[in-house]
Amino acid sequence: MEKTYNPQDIEQPLYEHWEKQGYFKPNGDESKESFCIMIPPPNVTGSLHMGHAFQQTIMDTMIRYQRMQGKNTLWQVGTDHAGIATQMVVERKIAAEEGKTRHDYGRDAFIDKIWQWKAESGGTITRQMRRLGNSVDWERERFTMDEGLSNAVKEVFVRLYKEDLIYRGKRLVNWDPKLRTAISDLEVENRESKGSMWHIRYPLADGAKTADGKDYLVVATTRPETILGDTGVAVNPEDPRYQSLIGKFVILPLVNRRIPIVGDEHADMEKGTGCVKITPAHDFNDYEVGKRHALPMINILTFDGDIRESAEVFDTKGEESDVYSSEIPAEFQKLERFAARKAIVAAVDALGLLEEIKPHDLTVPYGDRGGVVIEPMLTDQWYVRADVLAKPAVEAVENGDIQFVPKQYENMYFSWMRDIQDWCISRQLWWGHRIPAWYDNDGNVYVGRTEDEVRQENNLGADVALRQDEDVLDTWFSSALWTFSTLGWPENTDALRQFHPTSVMVSGFDIIFFWIARMIMMTMHFIKDENGKPQVPFHTVYMTGLIRDDEGQKMSKSKGNVIDPLDMVDGISLPELLEKRTGNMMQPQMAEKIRKRTEKQFPNGIEPHGTDALRFTLAALASTGRDINWDMKRLEGYRNFCNKLWNASRFVLMNTEEQDCGFNGGEMTLSLADRWILAEFNQTVKAYREALDNFRFDIAAGILYEFTWNQFCDWYLELTKPVMTGGSESELRGTRHTLVTVLEGLLRLAHPIIPFITETIWQRVKVICGITADTIMLQPFPEYNAAQVDEAALADTEWLKQAIVAVRNIRAEMNIAPGKPLELLLRGCSEEAVRRVNDNRSFLQTLARLESITVLPADDKGPVSVTKIIDGAELLIPMAGLINKDDELARLAKEVAKIEGEIARIEGKLSNEGFVARAPEAVIAKEREKLDSYAEAKAKLIEQQAVISAL
């Protein structure tokens, strides 16, 4: 084996070999249990980020673990067309390169342009997924816009429409005036903002007066430009100031519209003046109030967010109405919405109706992609009736057919599902699944899979002109069908029969409603088992937290704190990293700050760590459902772990290759250390499997680390040295056999988390064991064997380890050279302790560097010594001639003084109010942690001073 572990040399060739050999495919054995995971489809034109790496590591670990248990496993891979994101990327690209818009191209040519762009850049993310070691079945790769999935989408739309579960209606949506499309709540970013509250007088009609004799109401608003669309004023029915006015009217300033005063709980007596203007076409709350009181809806804005030339007036059902005039005063027509705000405030003021303006903190909705303020807009959209679909989906979680890990996410799911709103599924984009609906010139709507089908079903001749709906479906609509459309539905395929319902879905909690809930609803509606019972899409939902930076901040391009997972695998120079973080920024003014921070954090760029180290770190940080603060130190630690495993394997191979390891017969004698490591490994297998079965990847990683580093490398390899240097033939055979057996089992155990290094080493180890199989991937996963429990070996070895550690600690505390042989005395020994010393004298002497071991008689106190208590005995190391008492005390005093200086420095920092107020939470926590560890170190030094003073 190569002297040093170099992941760059082994990982890519190995992956290509695995893929070529077809090891990632299901084994096709239908007598075996199936296990299937559907990858959450990443955006086709995107690139891999830490969240992907994290979730995919967890999925691959599960898939490899189940595959090694002989199950028929499928990890289904694919990508998402990501409507709005992809269209924006391509629009930006043609604007930058050609100075054109999509309208210059026209719909078909622009869509061709997107397909072209997908062909060029769509492979990036799948290449990166290969680098992570993902054992997905690439031959089954799907894309949400490929033919099969597009057919499934049409099928679902048509069936839901025929069942009256899809309808078209005029509703209020989040409208992005820049992108000119409806967007989902998920794409709205609410920002805190300092604004104003305008108090405006609305004159009362018909001579009405308020309780205190005024002939007007004062209405408070943060959006005066929408006055043009007001159709009512709401007051709280309990408010004594206005109770008598409910049912009366006001005259709307500027347009002189007579609008009613309604009593509604939405008006808060404590807030503003207690009177709220109601604009049903431009505010979500007002829309609901309007529905309750049958107020008309008046749309005053164009899709670009400008004031219309004439308003659109609708009744509550969304039908056109002439109940109010559609006139808009000429001076406001065509004004941009924020310019209109200024003009309207000035006009109200000129009429003497502006009572006051107060500063006001408010939350403003922005589109997360377009970056402009979102308008609630009344538009014709397609909707799915969600309540009917939600009922069985709620029951499936209530009765345990679907379980959330961790369980607390069920509450989040229930709270949303039990109060579910109809789902707006249409988007005013060009890229996506076009809605399979056609209109004739009379405005009739026909829904079908194709235009031909529509004509046939409705007996429409060639003389009837049909035009297809311009809109496309929300990306989440096709994603909601992911678990079954990828397996060939609506055909009843073998894959669907074998792998549905799928086993586990790994997802971030942020898309629990947008994706998880909708998959459950759609799947249960369309997929039934042989008894007609609705099928769930998956049995378990494993929820992950977000990956944040080391200070707990969300990773984002604008913060400049994003780390590309592949930069940790391959390494990246500082100049390249700076270019990545500061090039093409939306906010170039942030570049300098980001540059400084990056130079401080990565002065030499990022070292290459290899895929296995990255995967191990991700698994180790995966504490259920919690956000993770990324830690480069942990990554270094797991890179060191891979080195340790490599070096330990080299040691084993050097001592076993071409040697008699007992695999072809011959007498074997197992030492206590051999029996101990076999028993220890057996226990490790049990705990490790339990952790993986319970989705505790963090615990599994910890168990693997602890066994490999501490038990196998630090202890067992040391404990084999006495046999290796002076054992009999049968003892040598026994120890070699144990070395190879445990290493081979350990490689299989670790394989799901760190696949590359384990396969590479296993290819060498299998030869010694006489294994002829091609790959570790398809080897059986280690199983716990109750017959291999060896309590005596475990207890005896733990005692020996205690004794060795005690001697080593005395050396360290007393500053005695590690190589200096010591005399060990044991006082007050139990019979068990005496037996253990006598049985393992040579082990103890070799590993603790002792020149002699003496068990003192019961009445012998022994010479002046440093002592340690272990089970059933007190260890004494006589100090005569070993240390100079005065020198040692002086050295310790110096150490104490140094630590006291550090403690004073940190205490000063933490008592500085300015520092505590400004520094991030994580930085303060780190300082407190340092303080605690210094205090602990000081206490230990003082203890040592006391021991030496007493000598």
UniProtKB/Swiss-Prot annotation:
Keywords: Aminoacyl-tRNA synthetase, ATP-binding, Coiled coil, Cytoplasm, Ligase, Nucleotide-binding, Protein biosynthesis
Motif ('KMSKS' region): 554-558
Name of the protein in question: Valine--tRNA ligase
Cellular component aspect of the GO annotation: cytosol
The organism of origin for this protein: Salmonella choleraesuis (strain SC-B67)
Biological role stated in the UniProt entry: Catalyzes the attachment of valine to tRNA(Val). As ValRS can inadvertently accommodate and process structurally similar amino acids such as threonine, to avoid such errors, it has a 'posttransfer' editing activity that hydrolyzes mischarged Thr-tRNA(Val) in a tRNA-dependent manner.
MF terms in GO: aminoacyl-tRNA deacylase activity; ATP binding; valine-tRNA ligase activity
GO biological process, one term: valyl-tRNA aminoacylation
Subcellular location: Cytoplasm
Record has Transmembrane as a keyword: no
Heme as UniProt keyword: no
Database matches in SUPFAM superfamilies: Anticodon-binding domain of a subclass of class I aminoacyl-tRNA synthetases, Nucleotidylyl transferase, tRNA-binding arm, ValRS/IleRS/LeuRS editing domain
Motif ('HIGH' region): 42-52
Amino-acid positions noted as binding ATP in the UniProt annotation, renumbered to this chain: 557
Gene: valS
Pfam families found in the cross-reference section: Anticodon_1 (PF08264), tRNA-synt_1 (PF00133), Val_tRNA-synt_C (PF10458)
Catalytic activity: tRNA(Val) + L-valine + ATP = L-valyl-tRNA(Val) + AMP + diphosphate
Family: Belongs to the class-I aminoacyl-tRNA synthetase family. ValS type 1 subfamily.
Domain comment quoted from the record: ValRS has two distinct active sites: one for aminoacylation and one for editing. The misactivated threonine is translocated from the active site to the editing site. The C-terminal coiled-coil domain is crucial for aminoacylation activity.
EC number: 6.1.1.9
Coiled-coil intervals: 882-944
Assembly mode: Monomer.
